Amino acid sequence: YTLTSTAQIPATLGVANQASIRRVFSGNTNPPKKVLVYVMDAADVIAADSAVLTWLATQKFDYLAGPDDITAAEAGVIKTWLLNQRSDYHAIYKAVLPDLTADSEAIVDFAGSGILVDGTTFDAAGYCGRIAGLIAGTPMRQSITYAALPEVDDIDRLTSLEMDTAVGKGQLVLYHDGEKVKCGRGVNSLTTVTGKSDIWKKIKIVELLDMVQQDIRLTIQDNYIGKLPNTYDNKLQLVTAISVYLQALAKDDLIASDFSCGIDVDAQDAWLQEQGTPTVDMSEQEIKEANTGTHVFLSIYINPIDAMEDVAVNIYL
């Protein structure tokens, strides 16, 4: 099923499943634009060769959540499948999974518990869909940190130290501020940042970087690959198109204004040498203008802008 509103939820689904989908549509600032629903038999188990994963690989979506009774083994299967999709096929899929130490920017390890809603208590698995919908309904300029869940009456409350410890472990937890329940710091499960920076731990930043990657990739596929001669001037035309896109992101305060996009001279130099073309006496401009067959080498630098989260206020008398 492809749903764009709660009015489209199939009446043939069980009451619990209908309620689960409604929670997804609760969103945050906005509801999710679209919710994909795959219905499995009660006895089905999510495995590496499951039809649901084959189907998902043909769909376009941002966040995935399993059934409310997903097991640890099934969550592990989804993690492995999703990371393979990202590494092998440039997918931008991400997942919200319960109590899963994944150490990946693409997996949100939701660790909420004792989630009380209208007399019913949910565990982390039962509320992953709600969290996935909340993230999907959060504008790119915002993070989910301290996003409220107004329907939640109470949770298993954590101390400040326990919350900090959970965040350090890459867990997304819920926080009760004494009046309402809201999300803790909007982090994914990444804890090992070798070769990366700490910004990859933030749900907001990864969502932005995935969007940029996909937008640029689709623009190149739809408007450039196979459609233009691979001349220097046409390479600059592509550079200009990407730069205009990045300028729009900077105008929306999604990235800093010091972005850059241009021909990757080092990569182009290395390719020319691999083809047997000596470059030692070539100027940088000559390397840029050299014939590179079907290949285009670009380098892009962006500096993502995070949301306001850590505020220190000193009051003096």
Name each region found by the language model:
Residues 1-19, 28-30, 135, 167, ...:
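Structured, hydrophobic secondary-structure cores that serve as assembly/anchoring elements
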Residues 47-222, 254-269:
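A glycine- and small-residue-enriched flexible loop/hinge signal that marks low-structured segments
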Residues 15-52:
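A broadly used, surface-exposed interaction patch
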Residues 38, 65, 301-303:
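Residues in well-ordered beta-strands of folded domains
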